[in-house]
Amino acid sequence: MRKTILAITAAIMFSANAMAQGDVYERSKIYEWPTDKQVVEKLHQWQDLKFGVLFHWGLYAVPGIVESWSICDEDWITRDTTMTYQQYKDWYWGQADKFNPTEFNPEQWASVMSDAGMKYMIFTTKHHDGFCMFDSKYTDFSIAHHAFKDNPRRDVLKYVNEAFRKKNFMIGTYFSKPDWHSQDYWWDVYPTKRGRNVNYDVKKWPWRWNAYKEFTYNQMNEILSRYGKVDILWMDGGWVCKENNQDIDMPHIAEMARRNQPGIIMVDRTIHGPYENYQTPERTIPETQLNYRWESCIPLTNDWGYVKHPTWKSPEKVINTLIEIVAKGGNLVLGVGPTPQGTIQPEAVERLNAIGKWLKKNGRAIYNTTTTKNYHSGNVWFTASKDHKHLYGIYMLTEGEKLPESITWQGNLPKKGAKIKILANGKSIKPTINGNNVTVKLPAGLPQQSVAFEI
């Protein structure tokens, strides 16, 4: 059995990783501006933060496979033929009795992310597999009722939120609208041949769907009423929607959410309308500036959660991604997957520290900035202070290349006689202006990474 499971795990890791690259959420094509003044104000505050973290942590961390998807009966998943689909699901559910993160240290998480320059945090309270990372009254399928049940920190969400609040983070909760463990979503009476979707006819069995709606409402009420101030409700599983005959009654959820948390930002991913207060392009950056609120969600590796042999993005890759996103008017939430023991991998800490060091010196061109009409010229990207008294340029150094002796851009001309200030060292440089072109000679000794300056 052990050999079979290992073989299955390897196969699923391969195919699911391929899926993770290809089948990603497309952002909505329509944006509806919120009218609630508290929501509008919260969105302004959130947009100023620019850089956040999204934690995926759950049962999938134990075998180190792509989050939840291996139990979904869709064509892109391949499994070892010696185990039936039901046997595999039973094995997967059984990881709950192995998930015992005795090294769980949310204070370490918060310190690492704060040092990385992140300003807000989103934590997976429940992914599509239905395993809750909080002590829910409505199911025993949670970390608080299995291998970790005797740990004083078994109500994981409580301690994650508290640790990040102490570091002055804006707090977000990820919640999956589909729950593949629930009998009211995947009913054992029927096979799961409808893939990720509810596996029975909602119109034929309305009482069961109503039970699922009530269950979902109650769990969202728990995470929004028992765990302190929450700023963002980040809802995943866009196929659970009215248009797909899976009406979860979002107006009812929204009324409860904003009663519990006035001004909360709601992110009903990919479902345009009043409950998608910002859009979430996944693993991608929009081609141009967008004139509404958005956030690219991109993992630090190729996977959202912990895997045993990750492919890491370099600090330079993340920094350059952040630069482009901010210049285009968005935020970046970076995916990090804690280990099954409850720690952040040293390789992640190393990269996050490097990102934080860059932001400590250059963050003035990132945080609390707004966009400029001329936001991009060659390798130079532009932002501005919110009062438009200061214009910033950032030369994006391509990975593997060395800083040039001088850089040139078009437009965004300095005022006559003004000098350009390098943010990393405070040195001022006199620019050369030729028509619409600006050239500056970079001082020696700069680190071989992207350079921010005030124009």
Regions found by a protein language model. Give the residues of each.
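Mature catalytic domains of secreted/periplasmic carbohydrate-active enzymes
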Residues: 21-455
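Bacterial Sec-dependent N-terminal signal peptides
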Residues: 1-23
